[in-house]
Amino acid sequence: MHTVSRLLAALCIAALALSGVAGTAAAQSAADGQFVVELDADGDANATFSDEFDLSDPDEREVFERADSNAELRATAAERFGEEMRLVSRTANEALDRELRVGDVTVETAVVGETGVVAYEFRWENVAAVDDERVVLAEPFSLFESLDRELVVVAPEGYAIESVSPEPARAEGDTVAWPGLTTFGEEFEVVAVPDSGGTTEPIEHSRAGTTHGGAPLALGISALVLGSLLVGRKR
């Protein structure tokens, strides 16, 4: 991808996937990065959406260094990303009896070996439902067919994952993860319960996870961020 286009996609400043060419490219392979949701017992979460750059590639290094050195660009990216995540939350709120809210977004950069990381961090209020002591994450991920990068969900401190759908590619203690482009849809759900401290029971999986083999269109609800964030919104 052209350097400027790569920068705009990574920093969520311009449209990415609503054109035919970009939509096809986004669908062919998962993006390098993660969406990490670290849940709290009250249903809030610390969320981090990251994009990764191969610093051994001159074009990608240039993009990362521009992001790393330009505070104004990072601030604009944080503002735009926050707007789009609030739009995601408002869409979910239409069908819920609780209100998802997105706090201020900060953009951080880091270098890990030969990888540059641009991370958007924010507080996500009420993203999970709380039923007695059960913490259930479904919306907004259940409203979309897939996510373009790895999704990682971490149970609240002192909790364990009781059940999850679809079956995760990784399940390690209080953490489950799916690779990018795994099919989610309305069956997506992660249930966490207080850890009894006894023998850990196997996590229940309601169905196997699959990844898209074709090229689904990127139909984000906005032309700014969701073309690269949420792929194939259900109608």
Predicted regions and their residues:
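Short, solvent-exposed secondary-structure boundary motifs
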Residues: G23-S29, T91-R101, G158-A160
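Intrinsically disordered, low-complexity linkers and stems that provide flexible hinges
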Residues: E108-V111, R123-R207
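Generic beta-strand hydrophobic packing signal
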Residues: G33-F35, V105, V164
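Hydrophobic alpha-helical segments
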Residues: M1-A31, V153, I203-R235
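N-terminal pre-first-transmembrane soluble regions of secretory-pathway and organelle membrane proteins
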Residues: M1-E84
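Structured domain cores in non-transmembrane regions
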Residues: D57-F122
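Solvent-exposed loop and beta-edge segments used for protein-protein assembly and interaction
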Residues: S29, L39-A45, A110-G116, L143-L147, ...
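Hydrophobic residues positioned within well-ordered beta-strands of beta-sheet architectures
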Residues: G33-F35, A45-F49, V118-Y120, R149-L151, ...
